[in-house]
Amino acid sequence: MGKKGKKEKKGRGAEKTAAKMEKKVSKRSRKEEEDLEALIAHFQTLDAKKTQVTETPCPPPSPRLNASLSAHPEKDELILFGGEYFNGQKTFMYNELYIYSIRKDTWTKVDIPGPPPRRCAHQAVVVPQGGGQLWVFGGEFASPDGEQFYHYKDLWVLHLATKTWEQIRSTGGPSGRSGHRMVAWKRQLILFGGFHESARDYIYYSDVYTFSLDTFQWSKLSPSGAGPTPRSGCLMAVTPQGSIAIYGGYSKQRVKKDVDKGTQHSDMFLLKPAEGGEGKWAWTRINPSGVKPTARSGFSVAVAPNHQILVFGGVCDEEEEESLEGSFFSDLYIYDAAKSRWFAAQLKGPKSEKKKRRRGKAEDPEGTTEQETGGSSAPEPLEVIKEVVSEDGTVVTIKQVLTPSGLGVQPSPKADDSASEASSTGQEPCPRSNAMLAVKHGLLYVYGGMFEAGDRQVTLSDLYCLDLHKMEEWKTLVEMDPKSQEWLEESDSEEDSSSDEESEDGEDKDQEDSAEEGADPQHPEVARGEQFEEYLSRTEQHWLKLARSHVGPEAKEKKVLKVAQAMAKSCFDDAVQDIAQARH
């Protein structure tokens, strides 16, 4: 009895500490949230201009991570919502809704009036009732400089049959958070964990909430037993036995002033309905057999039709006093919930007959050249210099290098064939974290995510597919060359250093401008089907930087903005014209 009493007392003490920390974080973050609420309201004003549902065929979505990818419960479609992208200087937040048709291999952008505000690191769960519903809770909005965060505590449902968003207003729900996990269990949503962060403080959660899909009411659970410590980004999935599995995740704690230590968890728990009445649950810690994933965070999770739980990718951070380096993964682990066993997925590779056939088709006779086989050599990039006049009459000169793709040059039939073959020769996703996963008809889809190359963050927009029945090879559905991604931080530092050196040497402004023009004349390309507003939003920092270099450091921001928009519009119009000419 004495021991039990001590444990209960200790548990209540931990709850009080967590409550104090939450109050402290909430108070300090309120000012930040007020600032961000104004920015969120601005974006919502733009969204309010949408008065009807529009469905527009489009290219694959732009690079992003921490979005949600969900399989439609009735149609052969995947639903992509939200996410974020960082280009080295600015963080972009999204609330776009895309539909990927599995049968047609096409993307459609769906604009619906009254959508949820822009967010990432939310949770989305699909349920079959009413022709299919996508339930979205929480997530975060980051300021453009990535220094401030607003954590949502709102609940939304997308009615897939009617394509309408609805905000569900119900009291007693979880506090604002991101990185939490949520699953559908019978006719309930069950939510666990997550974190809330301000500029100076943070708190991780281990609480559990349920939301009834019948009464639309939140309830906070108080499971018996020792459960997981507070964490975010964990595995959460329903097992065949009706329990809820929790594995891994990430948390951090302050070890001294301005020094935090992160923990990559590798423990596993089951949350089970307990005997003794409805609404009673119990935690049980388990130790499955087999080979579980190595220590990591940022992994992605999906559930296969046979209740096998899939874990893909992630990153293992190695922390030192003032540095953080990560090793990224592209491996796939499977947890067999029926046998309580982990194992690493092994791909068999394509059948030997297919290999031979591909090899015979792809290889050229020894010694042949592209001209001998009927191919055409790639055209040289074309440099174009033009003057642009902004609204206020400012005249600037921009230099643009048009690459073969920018000129609308089509690859030769041979190149098409080889690209088609490459998409099915087992090219696997590169190592990454925070990717989006979904399973439909026994096929695993992996979209986007990110990895780091030195100080640079590369955000991905590729899409891969793996047949979980055959387990032979990955198929590439959308390709991406990470080297083609714009990164502004590196070029800025180089220009700043060169500018400082030139100032010290006493060189004049004209020499400085010409040096900058010659350093990076190539501008961001326009994607097929992209509207100017989308192009400007994606590339705005590039044009602002270029405009500032032309009008000088003393120019007002309004003037710089006008010049930047004029330069972007000129480049956009030229690209659209080139694409149109290439079609004829």
UniProtKB/Swiss-Prot annotation:
Kelch repeats lie at residues 77-129, 133-187, 188-238, 243-289, 308-361, 443-494. Keywords: Kelch repeat, Phosphoprotein, Repeat. The keyword Protein biosynthesis does not apply. Gene3D superfamilies: Kelch-type beta propeller (2.120.10.80). Residues 487-519 have a biased composition (Acidic residues). Residues 11-24, 520-533 have a biased composition (Basic and acidic residues). It holds the Pfam family Kelch_KLHDC2_KLHL20_DRC7. Residues 1-10 have a biased composition (Basic residues). Residues 1-33, 50-69, 348-381, 405-433, 482-533 are annotated as: Disordered. The modification Phosphoserine is found at residue 418. This is Kelch domain-containing protein 4. It comes from Mus musculus.
